Protein backbone atom coordinates (compact mmCIF):
# COMPACT_ATOMS: atom_id res chain seq x y z
CA UNK A 1 0.00 0.00 0.00
CA UNK A 2 2.82 2.37 0.73
CA UNK A 3 4.06 1.86 -2.79
CA UNK A 4 0.64 2.75 -4.15
CA UNK A 5 0.55 5.93 -2.09
CA UNK A 6 4.03 6.83 -3.23
CA UNK A 7 3.04 6.33 -6.87
CA UNK A 8 -0.06 8.48 -6.39
CA UNK A 9 1.98 11.23 -4.80
CA UNK A 10 4.57 11.09 -7.55
CA UNK A 11 2.02 11.26 -10.36
CA UNK A 12 0.24 14.16 -8.66
CA UNK A 13 3.30 16.38 -9.09
CA UNK A 14 3.03 18.78 -12.01
CA UNK A 15 5.27 17.76 -14.85
CA UNK A 16 7.16 20.28 -16.88
CA UNK A 17 6.43 19.65 -20.52
CA UNK A 18 8.32 20.84 -23.55
CA UNK A 19 5.54 23.31 -24.23
CA UNK A 20 5.80 25.00 -20.83
CA UNK A 21 9.58 24.79 -20.89
CA UNK A 22 9.70 26.74 -24.15
CA UNK A 23 7.24 29.53 -23.50
CA UNK A 24 7.39 32.24 -26.16
CA UNK A 25 9.13 35.48 -25.22
CA UNK A 26 6.82 38.44 -24.61
CA UNK A 27 7.24 40.02 -28.07
CA UNK A 28 6.23 36.81 -29.83
CA UNK A 29 3.39 35.93 -27.44
CA UNK A 30 1.94 39.46 -27.75
CA UNK A 31 1.96 39.34 -31.55
CA UNK A 32 0.54 35.80 -31.65
CA UNK A 33 -2.23 36.90 -29.28
CA UNK A 34 -3.05 39.72 -31.71
CA UNK A 35 -3.27 37.15 -34.53
CA UNK A 36 -5.73 35.01 -32.52
CA UNK A 37 -7.88 37.98 -31.51
CA UNK A 38 -8.18 39.28 -35.08
CA UNK A 39 -8.96 35.78 -36.38
CA UNK A 40 -11.77 35.54 -33.82
CA UNK A 41 -13.13 38.90 -34.96
CA UNK A 42 -13.17 37.76 -38.59
CA UNK A 43 -15.01 34.58 -37.52
CA UNK A 44 -17.52 36.70 -35.62
CA UNK A 45 -17.98 38.95 -38.67
CA UNK A 46 -19.05 35.92 -40.73
CA UNK A 47 -22.01 35.42 -38.37
CA UNK A 48 -23.31 39.00 -38.54
CA UNK A 49 -26.23 40.08 -40.69
CA UNK A 50 -26.93 43.71 -39.82
CA UNK A 51 -25.03 46.51 -41.55
CA UNK A 52 -24.51 48.48 -38.34
CA UNK A 53 -23.04 45.43 -36.58
CA UNK A 54 -20.79 44.68 -39.55
CA UNK A 55 -19.52 48.25 -39.71
CA UNK A 56 -18.83 48.39 -35.96
CA UNK A 57 -16.93 45.10 -35.99
CA UNK A 58 -15.01 45.96 -39.13
CA UNK A 59 -13.91 49.22 -37.48
CA UNK A 60 -12.54 47.18 -34.55
CA UNK A 61 -10.77 44.83 -36.96
CA UNK A 62 -9.25 47.75 -38.89
CA UNK A 63 -8.06 49.41 -35.69
CA UNK A 64 -6.48 46.19 -34.43
CA UNK A 65 -4.76 45.54 -37.77
CA UNK A 66 -3.52 49.11 -38.15
CA UNK A 67 -2.00 49.06 -34.67
CA UNK A 68 -0.53 45.58 -35.12
CA UNK A 69 1.11 46.40 -38.44
CA UNK A 70 2.46 49.68 -37.10
CA UNK A 71 4.14 48.11 -34.06
CA UNK A 72 5.64 45.38 -36.21
CA UNK A 73 6.93 47.93 -38.74
CA UNK A 74 8.24 50.38 -36.11
CA UNK A 75 9.83 47.90 -33.73
CA UNK A 76 9.95 44.21 -34.67
CA UNK A 77 10.91 44.29 -38.33
CA UNK A 78 13.64 46.96 -38.18
CA UNK A 79 15.22 45.48 -35.07
CA UNK A 80 15.18 41.97 -36.48
CA UNK A 81 16.84 43.01 -39.75
CA UNK A 82 20.05 41.01 -39.74
CA UNK A 83 18.58 38.34 -37.43
CA UNK A 84 15.76 37.32 -39.79
CA UNK A 85 16.10 36.61 -43.52
CA UNK A 86 15.70 39.85 -45.47
CA UNK A 87 13.32 38.16 -47.94
CA UNK A 88 10.89 37.28 -45.14
CA UNK A 89 10.91 40.82 -43.78
CA UNK A 90 10.52 42.32 -47.26
CA UNK A 91 7.56 40.04 -47.97
CA UNK A 92 5.99 40.97 -44.63
CA UNK A 93 6.21 44.68 -45.48
CA UNK A 94 4.60 44.02 -48.88
CA UNK A 95 1.84 41.94 -47.25
CA UNK A 96 1.21 44.79 -44.81
CA UNK A 97 0.94 47.25 -47.70
CA UNK A 98 -1.59 45.01 -49.44
CA UNK A 99 -3.65 44.71 -46.26
CA UNK A 100 -3.57 48.48 -45.70
CA UNK A 101 -4.84 49.10 -49.23
CA UNK A 102 -7.67 46.61 -48.80
CA UNK A 103 -8.58 48.12 -45.41
CA UNK A 104 -8.72 51.58 -47.01
CA UNK A 105 -10.98 50.26 -49.79
CA UNK A 106 -13.34 48.69 -47.26
CA UNK A 107 -13.35 51.83 -45.09
CA UNK A 108 -14.46 53.84 -48.14
CA UNK A 109 -17.46 51.52 -48.60
CA UNK A 110 -20.71 50.82 -46.77
CA UNK A 111 -21.63 47.31 -45.60
CA UNK A 112 -24.57 47.38 -48.03
CA UNK A 113 -22.24 47.94 -51.01
CA UNK A 114 -21.58 45.14 -53.44
CA UNK A 115 -18.38 43.25 -52.58
CA UNK A 116 -18.11 44.71 -49.04
CA UNK A 117 -18.51 41.31 -47.36
CA UNK A 118 -16.31 39.67 -49.98
CA UNK A 119 -13.53 42.19 -49.36
CA UNK A 120 -13.74 41.66 -45.60
CA UNK A 121 -13.58 37.89 -46.17
CA UNK A 122 -10.54 38.21 -48.45
CA UNK A 123 -8.86 40.51 -45.93
CA UNK A 124 -9.41 37.87 -43.24
CA UNK A 125 -7.88 35.18 -45.45
CA UNK A 126 -4.98 37.46 -46.31
CA UNK A 127 -4.31 38.22 -42.64
CA UNK A 128 -4.57 34.53 -41.68
CA UNK A 129 -2.00 33.69 -44.35
CA UNK A 130 0.32 36.45 -43.15
CA UNK A 131 0.06 35.34 -39.52
CA UNK A 132 0.69 31.71 -40.47
CA UNK A 133 3.84 32.70 -42.36
CA UNK A 134 5.15 34.71 -39.40
CA UNK A 135 4.47 31.87 -36.96
CA UNK A 136 5.57 28.85 -39.00
CA UNK A 137 8.88 27.05 -38.36
CA UNK A 138 11.51 29.09 -40.17
CA UNK A 139 9.22 32.14 -40.16
CA UNK A 140 9.94 35.57 -38.72
CA UNK A 141 9.04 34.62 -35.15
CA UNK A 142 11.08 31.42 -35.22
CA UNK A 143 14.13 33.19 -36.62
CA UNK A 144 13.74 36.09 -34.19
CA UNK A 145 13.81 33.68 -31.24
CA UNK A 146 17.17 32.36 -32.44
CA UNK A 147 18.68 35.85 -32.65
CA UNK A 148 20.43 38.03 -30.11
CA UNK A 149 17.58 40.49 -29.44
CA UNK A 150 15.98 40.54 -25.98
CA UNK A 151 12.45 39.66 -27.08
CA UNK A 152 11.02 40.12 -23.59
CA UNK A 153 12.29 43.69 -23.43
CA UNK A 154 11.08 44.24 -27.00
CA UNK A 155 7.72 42.87 -25.92
CA UNK A 156 7.46 45.55 -23.24
CA UNK A 157 8.09 48.21 -25.88
CA UNK A 158 5.61 46.62 -28.30
CA UNK A 159 3.00 46.51 -25.54
CA UNK A 160 3.55 50.15 -24.55
CA UNK A 161 3.44 51.35 -28.16
CA UNK A 162 0.32 49.29 -28.83
CA UNK A 163 -1.44 50.89 -25.85
CA UNK A 164 -0.39 54.35 -27.02
CA UNK A 165 -1.58 53.75 -30.60
CA UNK A 166 -4.87 52.20 -29.48
CA UNK A 167 -5.59 55.31 -27.41
CA UNK A 168 -4.56 57.71 -30.20
CA UNK A 169 -6.35 55.93 -33.03
CA UNK A 170 -9.48 55.20 -30.97
CA UNK A 171 -9.77 58.92 -30.19
CA UNK A 172 -9.60 59.77 -33.92
CA UNK A 173 -12.37 57.33 -34.94
CA UNK A 174 -15.83 58.90 -35.23
CA UNK A 175 -18.25 57.19 -32.85
Where are these regions (language model features)?
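Small-residue-biased structural context
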Residues: 2-175
Amino acid sequence: MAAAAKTTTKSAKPRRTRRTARRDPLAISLLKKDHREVAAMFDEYEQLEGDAEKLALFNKIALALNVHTQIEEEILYPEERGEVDDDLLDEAYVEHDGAKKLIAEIEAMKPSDQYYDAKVKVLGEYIAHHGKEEEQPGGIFSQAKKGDEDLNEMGERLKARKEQLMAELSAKKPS
